[in-house]
Curated annotation (Swiss-Prot):
Its EC number is 7.1.1.-. [4Fe-4S] cluster binds at residues 39-40, 106, 135. HAMAP family: NDH1_NuoB. The gene is nuoB1. Keywords: 4Fe-4S, Cell membrane, Iron, Iron-sulfur, Membrane, Metal-binding, NAD, Quinone, Translocase, Transport. One of its GO terms (cellular component) is respiratory chain complex I. NDH-1 is composed of 14 different subunits. Subunits NuoB, C, D, E, F, and G constitute the peripheral sector of the complex. It is an enzyme of class 7 (translocase). This is NADH-quinone oxidoreductase subunit B 1. It is found in: Cell membrane. One of its GO terms (molecular function) is NADH dehydrogenase (ubiquinone) activity. Its cofactor is [4Fe-4S] cluster.
């Protein structure tokens, strides 16, 4: 039996259910899309292209430029009311199943910008699966968030936000 309980060894044969296998495959091949609206996007670039962090070992081989090729979207930065329809359109073009990570204090809660033009958290617009706090969050916190999302996909947990403390 594997550590996550997907595959079972029964006398030299490996057995599993189709649902368990598909959840295992989805959790090991997450294709992220970044939607950077402010300074946290710089930290995402550090994670995606820096030699220090190898995100390929977590199933995210490369960041996608098209929402039609992605199943995970990182929203980073403050979301203005003018940008909300664009984010909704990008989210609707993503493949099912799809997940949302609110990356940073501004995407999670609006940050310090409490005015009429800024949404107070992207969860007012999209169903957020993981909240990564920080200004900006560290790459380690993002890697931890992706690991938590992978665990959720494998266990088929219901939707609802997880706050990552990293």
């Amino acid at each position: 039996m594997s550590a996550d309980g997907v595959f079972r060894d029964q006398g030299g044969f490996v057995t599993t259910t189709v649902d368990s296998f598909l959840r295992w495959a989805q959790s090991n091949s997450i294709w992220p899309l970044t939607f950077g609206l402010a300074c946290c996007a710089i930290e995402m670039m550090n994670l995606a292209s820096g030699p220090r962090y190898d995100i390929a070992r977590f199933g995210s081989e490369a960041f996608r430029a098209s929402p039609r090729q992605a199943d995970l979207i990182f929203i980073s930065g403050r979301v203005s009311n003018k940008m909300a329809p664009v984010i909704k359109r990008v989210y609707s073009q993503m493949l099912e199943p799809k997940w949302v990570v609110a990356f940073g204090a501004c995407a999670s809660s609006g940050g310090i910008f409490d005015n009429y033009a800024i949404m107070q958290g992207v969860d007012n617009l999209l169903p957020v699966d993981i909240y990564v706090p920080g200004c900006p969050p560290t790459p380690e916190a993002v890697i931890y968030a992706v690991q938590k999302l992978r665990d959720r996909i494998r266990k088929e947990d219901p939707r609802g936000g997880i706050i990552v403390r990293g």
